[in-house]
Amino acid sequence: FLLWDKAHGEVMRTVVFGRGIAILAGSSAKPRDRILTFNARPGEAHYGVLQNKYLLERAEIRDFKSTFTINDDGTFSYASDLLLKLAATRAEMHHTDNNTLHRVKHYHPRAEYA
């Protein structure tokens, strides 16, 4: 979910994964910004990361960064980076995801948006 806090000029993204991870990420933003950034770190009082004990012991989340971009051609792009510390190798690993979404059809009852 995306949330907008107009009074504080902040945009927030909430993400929950069924395996036991919850992320509340956010940053400052203005109403017409076309690039939105979302950051979260474990242990922060706001914009933090929680995970269950099982995952924490095997793949500890160290950082989360994500960017949403509203492109001029009407597409929507995103990129996410979840930094993990793997217990098995003691190494850090970036779990990344990015994509560009294209609108297939407008679903709005008003004709000017059809």
Regions found by a protein language model. Give the residues of each.
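Soluble ligand-binding/transfer domains with enclosed cavities or grooves
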Residues: 1-113
